[in-house]
Swiss-Prot record:
HAMAP family: Kynurenine_monooxygenase. GO terms for molecular function: FAD binding; kynurenine 3-monooxygenase activity. Keywords: FAD, Flavoprotein, Monooxygenase, NADP, Oxidoreductase, Pyridine nucleotide biosynthesis. GO terms for biological process: anthranilate metabolic process; kynurenine metabolic process; L-tryptophan catabolic process; NAD biosynthetic process; quinolinate biosynthetic process. Belongs to the aromatic-ring hydroxylase family. KMO subfamily. This is Kynurenine 3-monooxygenase. It catalyses: L-kynurenine + NADPH + O2 + H(+) = 3-hydroxy-L-kynurenine + NADP(+) + H2O. InterPro entries: FAD-bd (IPR002938), FAD/NAD-bd_sf (IPR036188), Kynurenine_monooxygenase (IPR027545). The keyword NADP applies. It is an enzyme of class 1 (oxidoreductase).
């Protein structure tokens, strides 16, 4: 029987459903929330996401990229705004064609749902909150918007219900998986930067206002407005708890983000009206029960958003699952353990890299030594493209497994430390000495690749 039940009709669940429907499966998607296409908000979740190579590859394989291109905005570099008004720029890639893309979560989700609705072998169910799961008898119970309970049986179940996954929690309660959700001491809040006031800000850039223990981030929108995300401690000094009145809020933004503040006419209403989002990392093992239940996306491996890889790694799950179903002729008893073994090591790696990047963009990004290393790294990629490709480029602009990219990045950190140790300016570099170090690096790299 080729029937699949997917819990969660967000980004990962809907794309997974499209992949499986293409394989001939009868797919039912159950979503606890109302249909996002008919809802005015995105339930307080992060509105803008970063789409890069891994996500693009997964969408392209489903012939969706041409339509997705219409709703995303290129981000060609970081624009780093200092408190004194200075702005510095750091390209993401090696050349003009390497950039990431800002995309609205709700717009992308709506596009995927529209595609799913057109598939005759996909059924969509909204306002169906998972109430209970009988994993041994393959039965599920939902609560609908009227408070009534609806029971159903399933043949095979996929949990794609995000970081607060009920499927994962129910598997954990049965002793089938071990799982934890670790929260950062920081949260985030969505704030808007009006298009009327963004004329002085670079278009097609990811805007960053890093301030050591907190940060404002801005993603561009198609209408030239910017969607901001304020990342701030939940408690203590410079925290959401401390900014508890309008006077404190105005003073904080005037002092810390003066150029952004001037472009935020709705700051007070949005700050006190929008929910504060949580940031967490999910650890779970295994992700499956026999060949009958599988977790994907944030439900299995949710991460903090500071490498822009949450959606991309979830979409990569969908593509790799499809490839394994090809390889093993849809034998799920072989696919599920191999999928877990392949993905777990890589999603653990991107979780660690995301945490490292969290520290990088909060404080390191303005450190003179860090800036020098980035300058040298860029020059290494230009001079020796066959020898040196940075970890960031491997993560964002290739499909290199995350674990391999991380191992290469650790090797590169050592190389850059050696190159930078005696100098304070890139003009002081002795390129003959650099080439000697690069030769040693190449030998170590060969063992990883």
């Amino acid at each position: 029987m080729k029937h699949i039940t997917i819990i969660g009709a967000g980004l990962a669940g809907t794309l997974c459903g499209l992949y499986l429907a293409r394989r001939g499966y009868e797919v039912e998607l159950f979503e606890s929330r109302p249909d996002i296409r008919n809802s005015p908000t995105d339930y307080g979740r992060s509105i803008n996401l970063a789409l890069s190579c891994r996500g693009i590859t997964a969408l392209k394989a489903m012939n969706l990229l041409s339509e997705v291109n219409k709703i995303m905005v290129p981000m060609r570099a970081r624009a780093i705004h200092e408190a004194n008004g200075e702005v510095h720029y750091q390209p993401f890639g090696r050349h003009i064609d390497e950039y990431i893309n800002a995309i609205s979560r709700s717009d992308l989700n709506a596009l995927l749902l529209n595609k799913a609705e057109l598939c005759p072998n996909i059924k969509l169910h909204f306002n169906m909150k998972l109430h209970s799961l009988d994993i041994h008898n393959k039965k599920i119970k939902f609560e609908n918007k009227n408070g009534d309970f609806v029971e159903a049986s399933y043949h095979r179940l996929i949990g794609a219900d995000g970081a607060p996954s009920h499927v994962r929690d129910m598997l954990k309660n049965e002793g089938i998986v071990s799982a934890s959700r670790d929260f950062l001491s920081h949260g985030y809040k969505e704030l808007s930067i009006s298009k009327k006031h963004t004329k002085g800000m670079a278009r097609e850039h990811l805007h960053l206002w890093p301030r050591d223990s907190f940060m404002l981030l801005g993603n561009p929108n198609p209408d030239d407005s910017i969607t901001g995300s304020l990342f701030l401690a939940n408690e203590g000094k410079d925290s959401f708890a401390e900014l508890n009145n309008e006077e404190k809020l105005h003073l904080f933004f005037k002092t810390q983000f003066p150029d952004a503040y001037a472009a935020m006419p709705n700051l007070v209403q949005e700050f006190f009206g929008n929910p504060t989002g949580h940031l967490s990392t999910i650890q779970c093992s295994p992700w499956y029960y026999k060949d009958e239940c599988l977790l994907i996306g944030d439900a299995a491996h949710g991460i903090i958003p500071f490498f822009g890889q949450g959606m991309n790694s979830a979409f990569e799950d969908c593509r790799i699952l499809d490839e394994l179903l090809d390889e093993y002729q849809d034998d799920w008893s072989r696919v599920t353990p191999v999928f877990y073994e392949q993905r777990k090591v890589n999603t653990d790696a991107i979780a660690k890299m995301s945490m490292d990047n969290y520290h990088e963009i909060h404080s390191d990004i303005r450190n003179p030594k860090f800036i020098l290393q980035k300058q040298i790294e860029r020059e290494l990629m230009l001079r020796y493209p066959e020898h040196y490709v940075s970890m960031h480029v491997l993560v964002m602009f290739t499909n290199t497994p995350y674990a391999k990219a991380m191992a290469i990045g650790e090797l590169q950190s050592g190389l850059l430390e050696q190159i930078c140790f005696p100098i304070t300016d890139i003009k002081e570099l002795n390129w003959q000495e650099v080439e000697k170090l690069l030769s040693i690096y190449d030998k170590k790299l060969a063992k990883i690749i």
